[in-house]
Amino acid sequence: MKKLSILAGFVLLIFACKTDPGEKRITDPKDYDLHLSTTNRPTYEEAISSKEFWSKRLRPDSSGVGELGPLAGVYDLLFQTTGNPNFLRNAEKLYKKGMQISANDKDAFARGLAHNYISQHRFKEAYVLLQVTLEGPSNKHQTQLMLFDAAMEVGDYEKAYGYLGKIKNLKDYHYLIRLAKWSDHRGDLENAIHYLEEAKTIAESRDSKALKIWTYSNLGDYYGHAGRIKDSYELYLNTLALQPDNAYVMKSIAWIIYSEENNVQEAHRIMDSVMINHKLPDYHLFKAELYEFEGKVDFAKSSQIDFVNAVKDGKYGEMYNTFLIEIYSEAEPVKALKLAEREVQNRATPESYHLLALAQLKNGMTKEALRTIELYVEGKTCEPMALFHTTLVFKANELTDKVASVKKRLRDASFELGPLLTKKIETL
């Protein structure tokens, strides 16, 4: 998901700061227009068909073990294709039922449930479940793969590295994509890209559609982080060729059009199409940023409110805490602080702690915010929003030299941050 900034009340005419739309043109509507069709939904239609098939085979008392797993997987896929969290909860119930009644595949259902928990941002529950599963009869390799994922999510990096060592195999696709994630975590983007490119070669040699879709879209993200925007765009198009209704990739293309080309109207057009069938709340935040870029403050505020309401009405649980903390920090700082403290308990990572520091700062806790940054964020992540909030804390504490140092790093992340936040950084 792209990192979106919500800069309340910050309205600047910045069109002169970058080249005019067209001068840096990378994208072409002819490349993706076909995929904006709201009726071309092959992934969703296939998922619905599979749901009907497995539902009919499932016994009324849900006691058919062979049907529970596939049906739960279909519900997970339906969440991915619609953004409706009810599908995640449906899948959760089925995985739990499978663990309860299965004689031989409890660990497979446990891994499915753990993956479901991670999607719901219930990271600690996933981590504990996988640790228990590893101790019992299980496919150790598959469980250790997921334990790495869960350990990274909760910030247990020492254990994550240990799990990575246990599954080491440079010819294994699933090891390589995790090694890429570990490299990215350590700030080694060059090797992160290298390992994902190796994984891409394996996915293509197997001609696995699912693996190619995942690899192309994620490698496209890494290329974007590295400033290889054209390469990123090409991989997103490759993804759409395999999965025309991939909403994440369409949003990523819209981000290129906005952040790199300054073509706000085209970005709006893409997102308006995506949002018809795919209902993730954070799309409203992207729209808010586009409106703010145009100077349409009222529309931006309205879209931000739409986001908050969508999270509440959709019962998304903990899934959007990070975005809510940023929003609440401006208008309801006490609420932001409480939510940030809860998020740190759920996910003790630098990406959570920098939001805690932001909330502390907005509550006038300047020294506490600095302590949080120095203990849990500084030198522990290269994530642009973490660096931005670090800069705010350094400035509030009058650490001028540190502000200048971090600003240099942020300039290299202008594509990820977007033009609004990039301009804000220059004023610090």
Question: What residues fall within each predicted segment?
Answer:
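N-terminal leader/linker segments that initiate helical-solenoid repeat arrays
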Residues: 17-108, 128, 161, 404-428
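Generic helix N-cap/helix-start motif at coil->alpha-helix transitions
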Residues: 30-31, 65, 102-110, 136-144, ...
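TPR-repeat structural position
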Residues: 44-47, 81, 88, 123, ...
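Solenoid-like repeat scaffolds
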Residues: 59-62, 96-103, 131-138, 165-172, ...
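Residue-level recognition of tetratricopeptide repeat
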Residues: 73, 80, 115, 149, ...
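Structural motif corresponding to the intra-repeat A-B loop/turn of tetratricopeptide repeats
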Residues: 78, 82-85, 120, 154, ...
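Alpha-helical adaptor scaffolds
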Residues: 212-213, 308-364, 368-378
